[in-house]
Amino acid sequence: MSVMNGREVARESRDAQVFEFGTAPGSAVVKIPVQGGPIGGIAISRDGSLLVVTNNGTDTVSVVGTDTCRVTQTVTSVNEPFAIAMGNAEANRAYVSTVSSAYDAIAVIDVATNTVLGTHPLALSVSDLTLSPDDKYLYVSRNGTRGADVAVLDTTTGALIDVVDVSQAPGTTTQCVRMSPDGSVLYVGANGPSGGLLVVITTRAQSDGGRIGSRSRSRQKSSKPRGNQAAAGLRVVATIDIGSSVRDVALSPDGAIAYVASCGSDFGAVVDVIDTRTHQITSSRAISEIGGLVTRVSVSGDADRAYLVSEDRVTVLCTRTHDVIGTIRTGQPSCVVESPDGKYLYIADYSGTITRTAVASTIVSGTEQLALQRRGSMQWFSPELQQYAPALA
């Protein structure tokens, strides 16, 4: 056991079984050359038929058909695309963050027609974005000299309708933003002078038929409603100290658990498990297998696995036992996404390639997991602790 910020941190069991990439029984690996340079972001359509990736180096967004594992469309002239979110209701709609010398912006892309439908300029520097479950609102985490915040765009009009400060502490920056499955809570990974933070924000009241009210900042003491719309704005309800620098955040499919991946010089890669109801860290897991930086984390659709992306591999963590149950070695992975049916894991990398591997080839069976848990030396603890008008704002 180790101690980190007053909390003991469990380290991995020496008995954990690790599968090397492509060597597990029944493994099936397909390489998809996108050939657009380093891939910064990846998303998959709700039906699993399309992958959409951002190619920062070539100013393009590529669409890949998962049935053929081939690039079917390439959207050009998208300035330095990075973060991406796919529509839930609008299956062919993608929202992509872009960068230019004048401003960052959100590009709205129809991936079926290879068309940029609109571009919405924003003040400050965009770090990440996420959509509400009904696709009505886009939440964008931003950084600037005045601090870090989350901006809200109406996806129908492109208008900026709300901003909430994540922190007014100098030097604080947002890293990522995630939304609960029911759309009621935002989770923002941030880093400040004293370390990593998970900031919990409730979304606007939707008492007026799902519409949200006039623009306001949470730091203002009052705001006037427009018409009969709800006046309540986004509100920070909790800030959870993580310690090491936050790299990414992922939520379980039911929203009950948040997994925060962080990295520091003292403990390396760490995953904090947080109860989203109580806002308490229930356990912390230092993963010594990851020697370099952990950069991304995502959770499988059945909530059984967490995928941790690092410099030369994807590490698979059992969310029930918190044991490492698989390792997928591949060159310089950047991001991952699991297919909606849970059969495949798509791993994008900095060489411009997507690797598809069968999920069954990366994990051990449930029986093996139980055996590992019985043999392992793990100990756990409860810590004390269309073109629209610019939306610049």
Curated annotation (Swiss-Prot):
- Feature: compositional bias, Basic residues: 214-224
* Stretch list, region Disordered: 208-230
What does a knockout show? Deletion of the gene does not affect the synthesis of the major virulence factor ESAT-6, but greatly reduces its secretion. In infected macrophages, Rv1057 deletion significantly reduces the secretion levels of cytokines IL-1 beta, IL-10, TNF-alpha, and INF-gamma, but does not affect IL-4 and IL-8 levels. Deletion of Rv1057 greatly impairs the ability of M.tuberculosis to replicate in macrophages.
So which domain of life are we looking at?
Answer: Bacteria
Triggers of expression: Expression increases during early growth in macrophages. Expression is directly regulated by both the MprAB and TrcRS two-component systems. Negatively regulated by TrcS/TrcR. Activated by MprA/MprB under envelope stress. Expression may also be regulated by sigma E.
Question: What UniProt keywords apply to this chain's record, in alphabetical order?
Answer: Stress response, Virulence
Q: Does the keyword Cell inner membrane apply?
A: no
For the keyword NADP, the answer is no
UniProt function note: May play an important role in host-pathogen interactions and in ESAT-6 secretion.
UniProt protein name: Seven-bladed beta-propeller protein Rv1057
